[in-house]
A protein has these predicted regions:
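Signature of N-terminal electron-transfer/Fe-S-associated modules in redox systems
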Residues: 2-208
């Protein structure tokens, strides 16, 4: 009787579905350092014993670092857990879908959760801490426009906005929106982000 019930249960059971994240994280290949994205390492995957840690040298906020990294560490792991740059956040569990881990790497915005640390040897990196230490106008503009509510997403927005203003000193609202398209604000303060960036742009142009 029990065996018959088990057979019926097995027939009626629906197969489980593995959630595959949508967007660039699922399908991306290549190096995040060069503007593309790469699938994040599978958590818990055993690394073959033939793969050994390597020494990586990088410059972060103007300071040189040399450290041993495991082959499955992401750049975010290194920046946040090893070097203490806590502005590098984790909102989307490493799927490259939120922008909260954004940094500037070799002059371009990059998702640090999508970059393998071992591939970042020789990289020049700037985090939100470096932008704040340099007293960039974006910092004051974000404060004066009450842009942050929870503040969790703010570092990623600031990093992305800095790169935008370096390449476009007078961006339109649509250009700002396009630049920030990969950054999520869970408090919904998008209009304030735009105002802050516009104000910082005016300061950088000497108009404020």
């Amino acid at each position: 009787m029990l065996a018959e019930k088990q057979k019926k249960a097995a027939k009626s059971a629906k197969p489980s579905k593995t959630r595959i994240p949508e967007g660039t994280a699922a399908a991306g290949i290549g190096s995040a350092r060069h503007g593309a994205t790469a699938a994040p390492p599978v958590r818990g995957t055993r690394i073959p014993s033939t793969i050994i840690p390597r020494t990586v040298r990088m410059t972060v906020n103007g300071r040189p670092y040399s450290l041993h990294v495991e082959p499955n560490w992401t750049l975010r792991d290194v920046l946040r857990q090893k070097l203490g740059f806590t502005s590098v956040k984790d909102f989307c569990n490493g799927y490259g879908a939120c922008g909260s881990c954004a940094v500037i790497m070799d002059g371009r915005p990059a998702l640090s959760c999508m970059a393998i640390a071992a591939d970042c040897d020789g990289a020049v990196i700037e985090t939100a801490e470096g932008i704040a230490d340099a007293k960039h106008p974006l910092i004051e503009a974000y404060i004066m426009n009450w842009t942050a509510q929870c503040g969790y997403c703010t570092p990623g927005f600031v990093v992305t906005a800095k790169v935008l203003l370096e390449h476009n000193p007078n961006p339109s609202v649509d250009e700002i929106k396009e630049s920030l398209a990969g950054n999520l604000c869970r408090c919904g303060s998008y209009p304030a982000h735009i105002k802050a960036i516009q104000e910082a742009a005016r300061v950088l142009r000497g108009e404020a």
